[in-house]
Curated annotation (Swiss-Prot):
Originating gene: ccmF
Name of the protein in question: Cytochrome c-type biogenesis protein CcmF
Entry's family note: Belongs to the CcmF/CycK/Ccl1/NrfE/CcsA family.
GO molecular function: catalase activity; heme binding; heme transmembrane transporter activity
Family annotation (Pfam families): CcmF_C, Cytochrom_C_asm
Keywords: Cell inner membrane, Cell membrane, Cytochrome c-type biogenesis, Membrane, Transmembrane, Transmembrane helix
Cellular component GO terms, alphabetical: plasma membrane
Protein's GO biological process: bacterial-type flagellum-dependent swarming motility; bacterial-type flagellum-dependent swimming motility; cytochrome complex assembly; pyoverdine biosynthetic process; type IV pilus-dependent motility
Function: Required for the biogenesis of c-type cytochromes. Possible subunit of a heme lyase.
Major place of residence: membrane
Transmembrane segments: 8-28, 42-62, 94-114, 122-142, 176-196, 211-231, 245-265, 274-294, 312-332, 356-376, 391-411, 421-441, 444-464, 488-508, 614-634
Amino acid sequence: MIPELGHLALILALCLALVQSSLPLVGAWRGDRQWMSLARPAAWGQFAFLAFAFGCLTWAFLRDDFSVAYVAGNSNSALPWYYKFSAVWGAHEGSLLLWALILGGWTFAVSIFSRQLPEVMLARVLAVMGMISTGFLLFLIITSNPFSRLLPQTPMDGNDLNPLLQDVGLIVHPPMLYMGYVGFSVAFAFAIAALLGGRLDAAWARWSRPWTLVAWAFLGIGIVLGSWWAYYELGWGGWWFWDPVENASFMPWLVGTALIHSLAVTEKRGVFKSWTVLLAIAAFSLSLLGTFLVRSGVLTSVHAFASDPERGVFILAFLLLVVGGSLTLFALRAPVVKSQVGFALWSRETLLLLNNLVLVVAASMILLGTLYPLLLDALSGAKLSVGPPYFNAMFLPLMAALMAALAVGVLVRWKDTPSRWLLGMLTPVLAASAVLAAAGSMYFGDFNWAVLAVFLLSAWVVLAGFRDFLDKTRHKGVLAGARSLTRSYWGMQLAHLGIAVCAIGIVLSSQYSAQRDLRMSPGDTVELGGYHFLFDGAKHHEGPNYTSDKGSIHVSRDGKEIATLHPEKRLYTVQSSMMTEAGIDAGFTRDLYVALGEPLENGAWAVRVHVKPFVRWIWFGGLLMGLGGALAALDRRYRVKVKTRVREALGLAGQGA
């Protein structure tokens, strides 16, 4: 009975999504306040029904209701309860329900926290989000019903959750990623609402920017968590492989980065209006593209769900409808938007435009490398692999250029900057950066161009931010000046610091990582990176739904024991799947990483040993960026509720459409 109630809740949520997407939009066109007022209760009801449906599916998993096909295919009575909970979104149907729930949550949040918006603007925004919900709920109910029953024959037990997903990473990574993916629908909805209203001015940018910052922060942290999960779970010691589905999440993040900067220019200076709308459309369209790649069956990836062609066709049609419809509306409305505001070559507007171009080119390069092999295969049947050499060769120079421009962009002023003043600001920053880069490079011994470059660029970014802070607080004192600066400013500084930290981690871990693949018997030792690894053998271990051989490796340096690592080779009994669990000793400046390979004769094992310096800085930098975005979204000016002022800015007071 509970699964049937969940299915009914999905149908009712779809009905409310249809109401939300149509009547408020018609009301905005006709100037009918009663019809526009339906947007909020429809959004609330839709979210409530989606939450109820999600609760019903969770109940089915926790109660081992194997009469539900989705539960039988992705759970087992021996599965720990916390993995049963995360299994709710561990495969196609449940992950799509989570997507719909999060979209309903974003819609609910917009309806609650945007009361200061003019009613006509809010009605359009919620209507657009209702259209997106309608598409996903139709897809969910028609092709991917998570409540389908296996009747009259119900299995005694389930097939178990994919062993690769029986990890804490599944609990946190997909929800964070989906919060970012779906969050870009808010910026998309604001952009479409502005196009429908025919007014692309600073007001829509001001109100969509905090939502975009939060979505960008969630997506960035989700990507970081996915990288961390792959690093420790897959046993190969890497943190990024340019997998097509990794790329599918990275592309909207890059375009979203361009969007939050372009929104700032539109909000403060009233320029880049059409370009900002186009970025909002692109960011959400790339999120939908990621959904298509994961669920269409066109990819073979650890991230991809097995799927039938009907699902792929449905998502592709929805993607084309969203992209085609929004671009058509953009083509009709955007040409009439003109900006009378000018700016000089050396201005913040110019540097932010350069920022946007670099980020969009980077995303386009990744899009080309991701889709070209798929298109070639579809059109000619030829197989082509585009791997890390292509992406690294194209992406890294662009990021170096971005970091070089970033420091200048922080220091230049809006509209125009005297060149003599700018030179006086940049010269000491460049000199100090060169000194720090040389010192950092010498600390690591042998000269390395990549290391020198990353230290120079990172110091350039950090010191430019510090120089800007000193300039802004010079008349108030450091402490008083720091308190007077906005959260948006501190969020920017934190995010830029995260870029520098992440860049250092990427280069140092790639340049100085050491690895050995070898055969080790009990008592064997190996020296690597100044560390001494002693293999004590492996012992049999029984888990809740698996058996394993757990190794014991003692690590010492200069005669002092540092850690004992316990890598495992697990056999999950239900699916007879063998999995590798790495043994890791994490440190601020290095990771010691050991993975077991295959068992050999006489108690010996194939063992892979890594010493990975500064690898944690990659994820620490990513977290700093995400926290910076979240802090900027909490800026006081985004919470000021002055409804009349907003109406006047939008030019919508007293208008019906």
